[in-house]
Each structure stands twice: as structure tokens, then as C-alpha cells.
Amino acid sequence: MRDRIPARGQAAIIGNRTIKAFDHTLSTTFLISAVYPLGPAALILMPMLVGGVIDDLGFSEQQAGYVAAVEGMGLVLASWVAALWVRKVSWTSMLALGCIATALLNLLSANLDEYVPFLVVRFLAGFSGGSIFALTVAALGDNRHPDRAFGVAQVVQGAMMFVAFAAAPYILAQWTVGGLYYMLAAAAALMLLALPLFPSHGAQRIAVGGAGGDAPDYTALIWTGLIASFLFFSSIFGFWTYIERVGQAAGLATDSIGLALGISQFAAIVGAGAAAIASNRYGRAAPLILALGGQLLVLWLLVGRFTPATFYFGAGLFQALFVLANSYQLGVISKIDVKGNFLVLATGFQGLGSAVGPGIAASLIDHGDYSRINQMAALFCLVGMLMFLFVIHRTRHVGSPLAENRVSAAD
């Protein structure tokens, strides 16, 4: 029986199986991308939240770092649990549950000022946000062109976070850190509007037979990529969590720091746009090498005293290259993830890095000296990127595992 290519909303015929087609259209990609930032939003805003809980709630710098760490741990746990359900249950039902829980937990956070209850609530908020994040990553990874889909998602995320960072100094001044949590609650409630058009299930994936008809096993390489994701995100969030404090230690004004972080989100749009436009045109190794060099440059520049212009440049380049690299890293794992479950685990390892990184960074602060954080971030970034380059080299001849891509190629 000849395989049939599905039209939008129809089913694919593969052998004797009928498979519901996944919607790869740009409009659906943008819809998924609009929900994508909600999961890690608090972690991305952590520089402003850290400053807020220190200044408004009286937490120490170490306590603030542990708030970031425990929220990241909630995201990690949610991602690991999501690997068990993401291919089995309705995506729209889980998205509704995640959005409602995230909204309520952020409302509760806005009205707490005791450290231990605050930690517990932020852990739960990390779990609900992590469930949303894992779901959207799975949906984007099911696209025929995952590098491009993740690039689009990063563009949308950059635009949303640019607005959030630009508004954060005003919100902190008028309503303290609680205002930022109210903003996150409102965003979660707003995402419920996406439910009617959000995909209810993912795309079908198939294994390509190797010699003797057996499917090749890429498990070891996938785990290498997952560990590399952990190291890379430890580097990124270990430094990013304290970048606002790094700016203050350099003598920069609060408004200048907030503007720089807002500009960094605009720069992230540029980096994500580059990934979306380039897709796999230049391979995956070259963009990651570019990102590695740029990240190391920023970590060298933002040490000790520096000018506002240097801070604007460094924060912007850091975010642009972070989202560029993230798009290609997820594309690397999606390419060899036959069942589509490891890609969800990737968000867990990213979340683990975003949790462990701030915790390690907190332990490296020495009486207002943040330079050892830069050193840690540089080391983790270098090792993680080299591991990804190894995976890329070993899988350079591997094709897509998506069933619908196989159908198209066979027609």
C-alpha cells in the first residue's frame, strides 16, 4: 500500500496504520510559541525577582539564590514526570490545569513574606510552569523543522520578556515584588485563551531501520546531550540570576540595569530570529561555536567595574546567543529522539541546570565580589558546548524521526 501525504487536519496512512496529522502550519507554531514563555517566565525574570525579594522581603542574597534554585527544581521534577504522560494524555487538558495552577500560585506568592512558605510555593509554581514548558517543548519538537520552530518560540519569548523587563522597574517601584507575581498570574490566566486551537496530541514518530532491519540506538548520545544541556543552563542561569547584582556592584543605576535587561530581551529576539531564519541551513555546529565564543567574551567583560554601554552590550549579546544556542541544542536532541520522550526530559535537565546554577553561584559570592560566578559559568559553558559538538559530529548523517516526514520523503 502506498503511503499517503496528509493535508492539514487529515490523517497520514503509513503501512496499514492511520495516523492523525500534526499541524505544522506557521499559525499553530506561533500559537504554541505564545504559550512557551509562560513555563520559564519566572526564571527568566529572576534577576528582577531576586532584587525584589532582597529589597522588599528582606531575604539575604543567598536566600534569594535558593528561591531561584528551588523554583528550578520544581520545573525539573515536572519535566521528568511529563515524560510519563506527554504522549498519553490530552495536551489541552494538561495545559488548562497548568495555567490555572500557575495563576493561583503566583497570586499566593504575591501575598507571602515568610521565607519557608515562600520557598514551598515557588517550588510548586516551578512544577506547574515546568509542566507547561515540557508540553510546549514537545509540541515544538514535533514540528518538521524543529530548529525553526524553536527559533520562532524564542522570538515570541523575547518579545514578551522585553515588555516584562521594561515594565519591571516601574512595577517594583509602585507595587514591590508582589506586583511582578501579579503580572505572572495574569499572564497564566491569559494563556487559557489558547486552549481551543492548541494541538491535543503530538506527531507520530517512527524509527529508521539500520543494518539487519534494527533501529539504531542513540540513547548514549541523547544522554550526552542531556548532560550538556544541564551544564549549559547551569552556566546561563548561574550568571543570569545575579546579573542585576553584578550591575549594581559595578556602580550602575537601577534604571540603567532594568533598561539593559529589557534591551537584552530585544537582543534575544534577534538571536531567535537568526535561528528561525537560518534553521539548519548552516548546520548546527557553526551556530554553537559562535555562541560559545560570544558567551565567553561576555563573561570576561562583565567583571568588576564597567560602563553602562558595556553592560548593555554584554547583557544583550548574552541573551541573543543563549536563545540561538538553545534552539539548535533542542534541534540536536529532537533529531535523534525516536519516541519523543527524551526531548521532554531535555527541559528537565535544562531546569536542573537553572536550579543548580544559581545555587552554585550563591556559594561563590564573596562579600559582594561576583567574579567567581563568571569563572564557573565560563567553565560549564565550554564543557557543555563541546559535548553538543561531539553529538552533532556523531549524528551528522541521521534523518528526522517524524513519521510525516518519512511519508513525504517516500512519496
PLM feature spans:
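Helix-loop-helix hairpin linking two adjacent transmembrane segments in secondary transporters
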Residues: 143, 152-200
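Conserved MFS/SLC helix-loop-helix module at the cytosolic interface between two early adjacent transmembrane helices
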Residues: 77-113
